[in-house]
Amino acid sequence: MSTNKITFLLNWEAAPYHIPVYLANIKGYFKDENLDIAILEPSNPSDVTELVGSGKVDMGLKAMVHTLAAKARGLPVTSIGSLLDEPFTGICYLEGSGITSDFQSLKGKRIGYVGEFGKIQVDELTKHYGMTPDDYVAVRCGMNVAKYILEGTIDCGIGIECIQQVELEEALKEQGKDSNDAKMLRIDKLAELGCCCFCTILYIANDKFIAENSQAVKKFLKAIKRATDYMLAHPREAWAEYGNFKPTMQTDLNTKKFQRCYAYFSESLYNVHRDWRKVNNYGKRLDILPENYVPNYTNEYLSWPEPKEVDDPEKAQDLMLKHQEECKTCGGYKRLVLA
């Protein structure tokens, strides 16, 4: 049965990069499409794919590797679009912790991770660096990786550059220390993946819900695209509106996170075919996907032109690294423009 009432589950408590979803609600874009969206926050981020897959929630947000693994485990979920494209993801640590750019420096260290796939990724990496999973201590942290590093509960942990890395940098500044002492061992470099696409944040939906509500899905994405376009064109105004609706966003820390997220937002919302192929292969390497697995994504419900894929994704990642370093130093809102 089709419906205009949709439950939408975030992948975490409200964060700066959730702004398109909230803006679509704040500015009445969902209402313009005759949609009534209930935006929900999970008590446990690991529950999202299970709740969406079970049909208890209609739609949500989740990273690409989790979305692939969920379908492989029998949960009927499909990606219908992209929110945050390839945020740099890796093992965050502080200078002076005994950890260096050498992966083997992680021997004996306490490594924090959000959910089970973070541990699977680190375990797989140990095989390539003359180690075993017994050579480190895994600590499940949920979304508290930066907090636990600063408290000394863990030595390092998996996070993304525009969130946990920013938290570490700003904490160092408050202590009168150099923010450059917040470091990251990028997983895409360690695993030689050629992209950080495994952590691309996606709009996902329950398969039965999609089948019964195809027009509502199209309308939802149309409203999200409208909100994304507004945010990219007017980032300061959009951020102020989000902060008025969600006062927890009104901090210097969250503003800096939003500035660092800004370049990662997907303008088109399209699932990138090459990224899905790469992460599908990576999932097989991690033994979380069968060899014959077909990626569970579709661009069918996006009603605007699909952009051309980047010619050289590795070069684009190098340029993004420089871009994000500039954003860290200067702040502001600037998109990476590829020639």
Swiss-Prot record:
The keyword Acetylation does not apply. InterPro entries: NMT1/THI5, SsuA/THI5. It catalyses: N(6)-(pyridoxal phosphate)-L-lysyl-[4-amino-5-hydroxymethyl-2-methylpyrimidine phosphate synthase] + L-histidyl-[4-amino-5-hydroxymethyl-2-methylpyrimidine phosphate synthase] + 2 Fe(3+) + 4 H2O = L-lysyl-[4-amino-5-hydroxymethyl-2-methylpyrimidine phosphate synthase] + (2S)-2-amino-5-hydroxy-4-oxopentanoyl-[4-amino-5-hydroxymethyl-2-methylpyrimidine phosphate synthase] + 4-amino-2-methyl-5-(phosphooxymethyl)pyrimidine + 3-oxopropanoate + 2 Fe(2+) + 2 H(+). A motif (CCCFC) lies at residues 195-199. Pathway: Cofactor biosynthesis; thiamine diphosphate biosynthesis. Its EC number is 2.-.-.-. Pyridoxal 5'-phosphate binds at G115, E116, F117, G118. Gene3D superfamilies: Periplasmic binding protein-like II (3.40.190.10). One of its GO terms (molecular function) is 4-amino-5-hydroxymethyl-2-methylpyrimidine phosphate synthase activity from histidine and PLP. Keywords: Iron, Metal-binding, Pyridoxal phosphate, Thiamine biosynthesis, Transferase. The active site is at H66. The modification N6-(pyridoxal phosphate)lysine is found at K62. Its cofactor is Fe(3+). Responsible for the formation of the pyrimidine heterocycle in the thiamine biosynthesis pathway. Catalyzes the formation of hydroxymethylpyrimidine phosphate (HMP-P) from histidine and pyridoxal phosphate (PLP). The protein uses PLP and the active site histidine to form HMP-P, generating an inactive enzyme. The enzyme can only undergo a single turnover, which suggests it is a suicide enzyme. Homodimer. This is 4-amino-5-hydroxymethyl-2-methylpyrimidine phosphate synthase. It comes from Candida albicans (strain SC5314 / ATCC MYA-2876) (Yeast). The lineage of its organism: Eukaryota, Fungi, Dikarya, Ascomycota, Saccharomycotina.
